[in-house]
Amino acid sequence: MESSCKSWLLCSILVLVAFSLVSASEDEERLVRDLFRGYNKLIRPVQNMTQKVGVRFGLAFVQLINVNEKNQVMKSNVWLRLVWYDYQLQWDEADYGGIGVLRLPPDKVWKPDIVLFNNADGNYEVRYKSNVLIYPTGEVLWVPPAIYQSSCTIDVTYFPFDQQTCIMKFGSWTFNGDQVSLALYNNKNFVDLSDYWKSGTWDIIEVPAYLNVYEGDSNHPTETDITFYIIIRRKTLFYTVNLILPTVLISFLCVLVFYLPAEAGEKVTLGISILLSLVVFLLLVSKILPPTSLVLPLIAKYLLFTFIMNTVSILVTVIIINWNFRGPRTHRMPMYIRSIFLHYLPAFLFMKRPRKTRLRWMMEMPGMSMPAHPHPSYGSPAELPKHISAIGGKQSKMEVMELSDLHHPNCKINRKVNSGGELGLGDGCRRESESSDSILLSPEASKATEAVEFIAEHLRNEDLYIQTREDWKYVAMVIDRLQLYIFFIVTTAGTVGILMDAPHIFEYVDQDRIIEIYRGK
């Protein structure tokens, strides 16, 4: 008995639910039939043709999909919000089972032809036509989602630390302001960010909205439109890591060209390699940015600055290498170069010149003395005058040579005969001899002295050649060091001056706070 009661109660509930659903469906069907009896969706919903249809329009920004800098197009996902009144779509809820809203396809009713004026892909209408919501008061709400590609003028002045202002301009395509009057949705003069998804490339800074009314005259009707400004700032981490830092490091590699020794053949090779890498970065930037001639991007300024500095460094390096390999046979060093680069600049640059390369016999021989046995046949120096007097008439076979001529350029011999008739040796090495006494030398000895003089002259010339070469090398070293300091200072100043010129480079954007502000308004 109890189970049969429960079954009867359940069946009763199901019947009541089914009846209510059928009743509600019948009420909605009857309402739609009554509302659209004689309704013409092609005519503006006004009772008098002089009246305006007031349309409240708003925009909800859902996602910033992409900003194509080269084509100057912003792709965004938005929700449109349109509200207007249609006096033909009013009813009394009590007459139709308390129905408070109707959801119908948009093709059933009249709707304003609001389009995006600055559309960039040719599709001016929304693709997905969602249902319209009709309320008993005649208010019609339409919230279609749309993906727009709008034209956006890109200002590349401070790229990649740039801030862009993209606009989305909406208005009626065929109706003027005297027929369809636009107003801001719920008087919100901003874009709604309640459902916004944060972008990984851009931060939203501000999203104001403005209603523009262009007053007409007798010849031109009034026009209205609503313009939404999407002010965005680029997140710079990607470009800083992939573009800015490599460019800065490459620019300072130009300085290291002057740290290589001039004898190294890799100085010019390094400079040309850096030049080629800069060309690659210039081509990369040209593919990213629009081909505009109005302004020069910040990164292009820096690349151009680095390119010029590297070109100048290659030219200076060629000059340094040329000076490094100069010698006395091809060039003579002017006095002003010797004074500036060998005396003043090294002291100014805190450079200490290496010791000059001198021949060992010029460095270590303070004086020169006759050997104990100048010639094996002459015996001791005391016996030399006796030997000379003994040979007497054979002087024609001997050549006379002053002892003052038997000297080395840095070790001059001073010989004289003492009162005892012996040939004495002076203590010092001087060019001028204190005595003009002479001795007789055999032809073999004369040839030997000539050979010694030839060797001494050759050594003197070789030493002069080496010293001149070393002077030119040191001049090249001084220029290298000077250019190292100059290029480091100029490169540092140029890097700071160009990159720090961006106005928002150090500003932090709290995206969550901005979204919360425009969500709570």
From Swiss-Prot:
Tissue occurrence: CNS in embryos.
Q: Please give a single GO biological process term from the UniProt record.
A: chemical synaptic transmission
Signal peptide residues are 1-24
Q: Where in the cell is it found?
A: Postsynaptic cell membrane; Cell membrane
Q: Which domain of life is it from?
A: Eukaryota
Work out whether the entry's keyword set contains Transport.
yes
Q: What is its main location?
A: membrane
Question: Member of which family?
Answer: Belongs to the ligand-gated ion channel (TC 1.A.9) family. Acetylcholine receptor (TC 1.A.9.1) subfamily.
Name of the protein this chain belongs to: Acetylcholine receptor subunit beta-like 1
